[in-house]
Swiss-Prot record:
Primary gene name: glmM
Keywords in alphabetical order: Isomerase, Magnesium, Metal-binding, Phosphoprotein
Free-text cofactor note: Binds 1 Mg(2+) ion per subunit.
Organism the protein comes from: Polynucleobacter asymbioticus (strain DSM 18221 / CIP 109841 / QLW-P1DMWA-1)
SUPFAM superfamilies in alphabetical order: Phosphoglucomutase, C-terminal domain, Phosphoglucomutase, first 3 domains
The protein, known as: Phosphoglucosamine mutase
Pfam families: PGM_PMM_I, PGM_PMM_II, PGM_PMM_III, PGM_PMM_IV
Length: 447
């Protein structure tokens, strides 16, 4: 059954346009509450945690959701602005029925969204989301006054999460002598991430820590690393750490201003665990993970498999394989031996631990990995065009793949949101990659 409201990462859209409107949010809270109470044990009181990022619309959506949950007889614990992975952690640690995050991650402030975590700190299953959607078809009601849900504020939510993050860093190590610039994207980590690194001994220079409700991800954070690069150079810092608006993505910068994306950091995490004798089995990347990273990880003597783009699919394949480490170039990095979901702060701590234990810089940890140039062309499509049925196009794709052999990779996929065909070619030569990509793209009939 196809879902009507839930996408790959919850429900998301522009504030003020359906479904990101108060009336629907109240219905959503009520529907989710009804599903939770149906699954609860007899006489068990359901309680959910609601966290949010720093968007001004968070207040509006939080109040609407709270009303819906209360009407369904579910207690609500409010923790204010906190990273998405912080909600996952607290939901599990406090033995709650579910966690709710109000955030649109790396999107601009005009957007917002809702996603749910299970009692175990995992993203909700498709079946649970379908059950919520089915309940949304019913009219909203209200339990008796005696059964109404109550609202509480969890005042020490940030402190609890900070301590959890610190607990994932090896106890025999510290960050003394390290000068870090931390960019929190004017988002949810503005009052958590700097404290984590400072309390572990680092000298911390913070940017992107002045949220006003409208400046989240605005020229800062993991999706706009230029500000971090400039600050690292200006301060003569050893390293820069950039998170996105809800702090589940990570990008890092070394002292020279070189940017390291999620692909490269994924290799660092995998190699460090292998060097420490940990049994990994393998690593999960995505369809877009650079071929050089795949080759380097396989060179460690472990497996490598690709999931569809999106941290949800990486997590699904990790669980399917029973593996621990996965991620994607955008900076979603999963360390399931540390947390149940992707966490930018915790991933940064794991990279810092690898640097400390090896007494090497990030560049030195990656000096044997040469990232392949990757060319991505977006070609506009006619509405009726089916590229998979185009014999001429597919013949050229096959020819390019044969020419590249094992020294390159071709990926063709239609955009899920726009009338575009994405043509990606990567190989050791940028010129070869560009020519190969053009030879395919030029055969696509455009409007």
């Amino acid at each position: 059954m196809k879902k009507q409201y839930f996408g790959t990462d919850g429900i998301r859209g522009e504030v003020g346009k359906f479904p990101i409107v108060p009336e629907f949010m109240t219905r959503l809270g009520y529907a989710a509450g009804k599903v939770l109470t149906k699954d609860a044990k007899p006489h068990e009181r359901c309680k959910v945690l609601i966290g949010k990022d720093t968007r001004v619309s968070g207040y509006l959506l939080e109040a609407a959701l709270e009303a819906g949950f209360a009407a369904a007889g579910v207690d609500v614990m409010l923790c204010g602005p906190i990273p998405t992975p912080g909600v996952a952690y607290l939901t599990k640690a406090l033995r709650l029925s579910a966690g709710v995050v109000i955030s649109a991650s790396h999107n601009p402030y005009q957007d917002n969204g809702i996603k749910f975590f299970s009692a175990k700190g995992d993203k909700l299953s498709d079946d649970f989301e379908l059950a919520i959607e089915a309940e949304l078809e019913n009219p909203i009601g209200c339990v008796s006054s005696k059964e109404l849900g109550k609202a509480f504020r969890l005042d020490d939510a940030a402190g609890r999460y900070i301590e959890f993050c610190k607990s994932t860093f090896p106890g025999d190590l510290n960050l003394k002598g390290l000068k870090l610039v931390v960019d929190c994207a004017n988002g949810a980590a503005y009052h958590t991430a700097p404290h984590v690194f400072h309390e572990l001994g680092a000298e911390v220079i913070s940017i992107g820590v002045s949220p006003d409700g409208r400046n989240i991800n605005d020229g800062c954070g993991a999706t706009a690393p230029a500000a971090l690069i400039a600050k690292v150079k200006e301060e003569g810092a050893d390293l820069g750490i950039a998170l996105d608006g809800d702090a589940d993505r990570l990008q890092m910068v070394d002292s020279t201003g070189r940017l390291f994306n999620g692909d490269e950091l994924l290799y660092v995490l995998a190699k460090d665990r292998i060097d420490r004798g940990q049994q990994l089995g393998g690593v999960i990347g995505t369809l877009m993970t650079n071929l050089a990273i795949e080759n380097a990880i396989k060179g460690l003597g472990i497996g490598f498999e690709r999931a569809n783009v999106g941290d949800r699919y990486v997590l699904e394949l990790l669980k399917q394989k029973g593996w621990l480490i996965g991620g994607e170039g955008s900076g979603h990095l999963l360390c399931l031996d540390q947390h149940s979901t992707g966490d930018g702060t915790i991933a940064a701590l794991q990279v810092l631990a690898a640097m400390s234990q090896n007494k090497k810089s990030l560049s030195e940890l990656l000096n044997t990995v040469k990232i392949f140039p990757q060319v991505l062309l977006n070609v506009k499509l006619k509405p009726s065009y089916d590229w998979k049925s185009d014999e001429v196009l597919n013949k050229q794709i096959t020819k390019v793949e044969a020419d590249l052999k094992d020294a390159g990779r071709v990926l063709i996929r239609a955009s899920g949101t726009e009338p575009l065909l994405r043509v990606m070619v990567e190989t050791q030569s940028a010129d070869v990659a560009m020519n190969a990509a053009k030879s395919i793209a030029d055969l696509v009939p455009t409007p």
